[in-house]
Amino acid sequence: MSFMNMESADLLPYGLGSPELVEFQNGYFVCKDICSDLACLDALLKENGFRLRLESAYRPFEKQLSIWNRKARGELALLDEFGKPMQRPQDEEELMYAILTWSALPGASRHHLGTDIDVVDGNACPEGYEVQLTPDECTGMFAKFHKFLDARFAANGAFGFSRVFVPGRGKIKPEGWHIAHLPTSRRLLEGFSLDTLRRIYEATDIACKRVILARLDSLAEDFIYPYFI
């Protein structure tokens, strides 16, 4: 995609442009600036009996847009606040908010920064099990893994990584599996502009476009800015 003759670097806060990425694990790419700290976290987890397994990493705008539109069309499952499948609302605004329960607006998911990853403990994953990234997994098979991470995050002992989607912050449901390298993501988000995101949406075939554009200011207060930490 090309928007408004902007430079590639100016589009990076939205998942457009050409970030410097490195493959870290099994086809998952991350921002090159986090690789050293991510390797340290990987080694720390290994020393304590865990195996860091990535389930998602860099996700460009186009991929986020595809996920959003497929959820809007009913091609991907919509989950309620408890992580259970729900019926697709017919009202456009209700549909938008249903998607936002677990999915960020395209260009505002943080995954496009290359600093955020979804993680589980590979050692605790049963053979053949397809990870769903749900709250039940965090409190079930991966509970020990997340408890260890919680302690490291609380002590600022996770090499710059921490959780972003936590209880009491914004209106996206907590995602225990989603961690971010905060020093790098803060730097990359400095160039973010809601007006630019609005112009990108105006030029994009995004589901629920009318209501997104009409509500974008309030959506940003609830679903974007709280996660700029």
What are the residue ranges of the model-derived segments?
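Cell-envelope/glycan interface and biosynthesis
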Residues: 2-229
